Amino acid sequence: MTGVAAPERIARAVRADIRALTAYPVADAAGCIKLDAMECPYELPAEVRDDIARAARETPLNRYPAAANPALQAQVRQAFEVPAQAGLLFGNGSDELIHLIIQACCEPGDTVLSPWPSFVYFDMAARLSHARFVGVPLTAGLELDLPATLAAIEAHQPKVVFLALPNNPTGDLWPDAAVRAILDAAPGLVVLDEAYQPFAGHTWMPRIMDEPNAVVMRTVSKIGLAGLRFGYLAGHPAWIAEFDKVRPPYNMDVLSQAVLAAVLRHKPVLDAQADRLRADRQPLADGLAALPGVTVFPSAGNFVLARFCGKLDGNAVHLAPKTRKILVRNFSNAHPLLADCLRISVGTPTENAAVLSALQDILSA
């Protein structure tokens, strides 16, 4: 076998479905205005960074993380209003938590279901675990198709249903009555993904202990800590105990825990940043809607989805901001329902004005 080339060895060793995948694309952002990843555009104030530096200096790196961090759990409960009776599990962002949920719940061939299009990692994580992913198409207006979703639940009996509240990339926040109908119909677990909850002003967290088949999943990525990779899952302690069984040992490094603890002592700073982005979302949406041939979809997130139906399609329009080193996310080829759609994160007022100017110039040329 020593003379066998690497590609042949890979074909023998790596799963065929993995070889067929492409790695998650991350654009080169050097020197660019980043409006493509729903990050907070504001850096933390100096006093917060000083506390982070102090916490890092005082954190020993020669020992593995403790199995639990009761002090940080207490901080997270207080900062994010997690019910005292709920179980709480930390993960490296929502991505790891999605993996843990599917690994714990699904045997090969079991079904994971979500309205679609939604967060792409629901699909990817299911496939990586040999589960079957069922995406229930949204309506032509990118709203939840509740009858179709309930019919799919009845037909496929999913072990796990993922609901992004609000949804990414559409921005739609589905009504409580629709979520309630899905909770009542689902035979397994319903994961309420509240990654963008700080911008929606709505949450299921206070009610999570009343829902025997639901958990709330969140991340700190969208509120100014995307570089930290920290997510948390809250729900009935019995659910959390099962997911904890498949959690890798020492999954949360000590620096991430120390940094989060330091930042949460300044929680009003994060809240103010979220409030600012929520306030700036509507002017960005209004500016996009004023452009010729543009349809803007309502958003409860820190981003706006717009469809470009004029003389230029979404692929062509996408190039205009890029030539000015402004990154936005092109969904034109991601799903038929997203044809000619760009998703634009809410940035600073200056950044929002820059992307609107670039789009105005190309659409008016």
From Swiss-Prot:
Which GO BP terms apply?
A: L-histidine biosynthetic process
Which cysteines in this chain are paired by disulphide bridges? none
Q: Which cofactor does this sequence's record say it needs?
A: pyridoxal 5'-phosphate
Q: Which reaction does it catalyse?
A: L-histidinol phosphate + 2-oxoglutarate = 3-(imidazol-4-yl)-2-oxopropyl phosphate + L-glutamate
Pathway listed for it is: Amino-acid biosynthesis; L-histidine biosynthesis; L-histidine from 5-phospho-alpha-D-ribose 1-diphosphate: step 7/9
Q: What is its EC number?
A: 2.6.1.9
Record keyword Amino-acid biosynthesis present: yes
**Entry-linked InterPro entries:** Aminotransferase_I/II_large, HisP_aminotrans, PyrdxlP-dep_Trfase, PyrdxlP-dep_Trfase_major, PyrdxlP-dep_Trfase_small
Q: Residues where N6-(pyridoxal phosphate)lysine occurs?
A: K222
The record's comment on protein family reads:
Belongs to the class-II pyridoxal-phosphate-dependent aminotransferase family. Histidinol-phosphate aminotransferase subfamily.
Oligomeric form and interacting partners: Homodimer.
- NCBIfam families referenced in this protein's UniProt entry, alphabetically: hisC
This one is known as Histidinol-phosphate aminotransferase 2
Q: Which organism is it from?
A: Bordetella pertussis (strain Tohama I / ATCC BAA-589 / NCTC 13251)
Gene that encodes it: hisC2
